[in-house]
Design a protein with these regions (language model features):
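Long, compositionally biased, intrinsically disordered regions
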Residues: 33-199
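Active-site-proximal beta-strand/loop segments in catalytic clefts of secreted hydrolases
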Residues: 191, 205, 237-238, 260-264, ...
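Surface-exposed intrinsically disordered loops and tails
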Residues: 78, 268-287
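A structural motif detector for short, solvent-exposed N-terminal "entry" segments of globular domains
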Residues: 194-239, 289-294, 311-326
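N-terminal single-pass transmembrane signal-anchor helix
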Residues: 2, 8-39
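Conserved beta-structured recognition patch
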Residues: 281-348
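Intrinsically disordered, low-complexity Pro/Gly/Ser/Thr-rich segments with frequent PxxP/GP/PP motifs
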Residues: 241-277
């Protein structure tokens, strides 16, 4: 009996020691938690700005890949009564004027029609729809990681937006999808600021049209996102005479061609997706009315960043110089090299 009593006393002592240890450890955790709260320390990155980007990237990707999305058109204000989930059927101009939250899903799968329609959305329009702050920018990429068709492995379905290297800090959210024998990745990067990758290319210019046709300028958007023309301008110089046009409206879809023309009614559209009338604005001519010089001239496409006041040349086209003397019906065609050198242009 005495031996049993000794065992019982030892067990009670051990239990008491364990309880005292747990109580002390719990008290320690409470003190540590209170200290961290008072010191306003944050676990994880210890940087509120980075945490803010992390939340924005995570929420943005969730909104992008959790549903069909929505579009609210503009009609003297946002027309909520005619809002729709079929945002992918709206034009680039309509999407830019209204409010869109692109969603990529249909019946719980990635919808290729919606992915293709991202070319009609501007980066700023997507950022606003996903709820990003005004000082944030984004980059979105969608790729085929695995496929039953080896030729589709690594295929880029969309890759556009502000490059990470132009921003001081960034955060990335990633999601993969397995469907129809393929695996896709959707990667959303959210940046603190950054310089927009706004590049447009003048690919062909008609200075001396034949048969009383209109002057025209063909512009290509090599980006996957659409680009709004607000902030873009054109400058034409011939001798001591110069004319400028600040573009106030219009959107060019990603990976598409647009025509700026002196007369839309007589313009041959070809494979252009958009036609903008610059004849009514007096910049391009038609018939006997010249907007661009028939002799020697210089045309510049310019862009002004939102935080700058001076426009920067993006493309320059010069004619009436060696090898580039035009006759009626000939156009200047860019060969795809230097956007500022006359040697990159030929006659067609």
């Amino acid at each position: 009996m005495r031996r049993a009593s000794l065992h019982s006393e030892r067990d009670e002592g051990a239990l008491t020691a364990v309880i005292e240890f747990l109580s002390a450890f719990t008290l320690f955790l409470m003190i540590l938690t209170a200290f961290l709260s008072l010191a306003q320390l944050q676990m994880g990155s210890n940087d509120p700005a980075v945490d803010r980007l992390d939340r924005a990237a995570s929420l943005g990707l969730d909104r992008l890949t959790s549903g069909e999305g929505w579009f609210v058109p503009m009609d003297e204000g946002l027309d909520y009564t005619n809002s729709t989930a079929d945002w992918h059927l709206a034009s680039a101009d309509a999407l830019h004027e209204g409010r869109v939250q692109p969603g990529l899903m249909l019946h719980h799968k990635l919808d290729m029609h919606r992915i293709s329609a991202l070319h009609n959305v501007t980066e700023d329009g997507m950022a606003a729809g996903l709820g990003l702050d005004d000082d944030m920018s984004l980059h979105l990429s969608i790729r085929v990681l695995e496929s039953d068709d080896p030729q589709r492995v690594g295929l880029s379905l969309f890759d556009g937006g502000t490059e990470r290297g132009t921003a001081p800090s960034s955060s990335t959210a990633y999601r993969s999808f397995q469907q129809d024998g393929e695996r896709y990745s959707v990667v959303l990067e959210v940046h603190d600021g950054g310089r927009k990758n706004n590049i447009l290319e003048i690919t062909e210019v008609m200075v001396r049209p034949s048969s009383s046709g209109p002057e025209w300028i063909e512009i290509h958007n090599p980006n996957d996102f659409a680009i709004a023309l607000r902030g873009w301008s054109l400058n034409h110089t011939s001798g001591s005479v110069s004319s400028n046009l600040l573009l106030q409206s219009g959107v060019i879809s990603g990976q598409s061609l647009s025509l700026l023309t002196g007369d839309p009614s007589s313009q041959v559209v070809g494979n252009a997706s958009h036609v903008l009338d610059l004849g009514a604005l007096g910049f391009l001519g038609v018939g006997q009315i010249d907007g661009l010089s028939d002799g020697r001239g210089l045309l510049s496409l310019r862009y002004t960043q939102l935080d700058e006041i001076t426009p920067a040349d993006v493309v320059r086209v010069e004619w009436g110089v060696e090898g580039l003397f035009l006759v009626a019906g000939q156009s200047l065609v860019w060969e795809g090299n230097d956007r500022f050198s006359s040697s990159s242009w030929s006659l067609e």
